[in-house]
Amino acid sequence: MKKLASFLALLLFVATACDNEKVVDETKLPVNAQDYIEAHFPNARISQVVRDRDDLETSYDVILDNQVKLEFDKKGDCYSIESRRTEKLPDTVIPLKVLEYVQEHYPDAFITDWEKDKTDQEIRLSDSKELVFNLAGTFLRIDD
């Protein structure tokens, strides 16, 4: 009986662990995420959506057919965008103050990645520099 209980507990653990990441249909994306993609990447199609459940958090990883990867929280708010190093992100996805700083200080470069967390936001430029800004868009430092 003990072995059966242990086996069932292990089976339950494995089953729930396997459900952490799951490929889902794009209709399962929050409406805000669908609207965001349509507004900022109108010529791209969604190739894959992966729902990630970790503890009490749910997020969505979206890969577009142009190889751009976006990450959304459970409400559909975008917090990360990655492109190929040769691809410029649309200006509309970058906060205006960050975009203006880059245009003024790095006129020959463009933004390829953007990520926001609870305390700051970080971008990667086409020349591989990584710049860190606070949430209001004020430049803080170059990240090595």
Report each predicted region and the residues it spans:
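Post-signal-peptide N-terminal segment of Sec-exported extracytoplasmic proteins
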Residues: 31, 35-75, 79-80
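Intrinsically disordered, low-complexity Ser/Thr-rich linker and spacer segments
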Residues: 80-92
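Sec-dependent signal peptide recognition
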Residues: 2-9
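Conserved histidines in hydrophobic membrane contexts and catalytic metal-binding motifs
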Residues: 60-62, 121-130
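Short, non-transmembrane alpha-helical segments in secretory-pathway proteins
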Residues: 25-46, 89-110
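Residue-level detector of conserved, function-critical positions
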Residues: 112-117
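A short, surface-exposed beta-strand/turn
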Residues: 69-83, 130-143
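C-terminal motif of bacterial Sec signal peptides marking the signal peptidase cleavage site
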Residues: 14-17
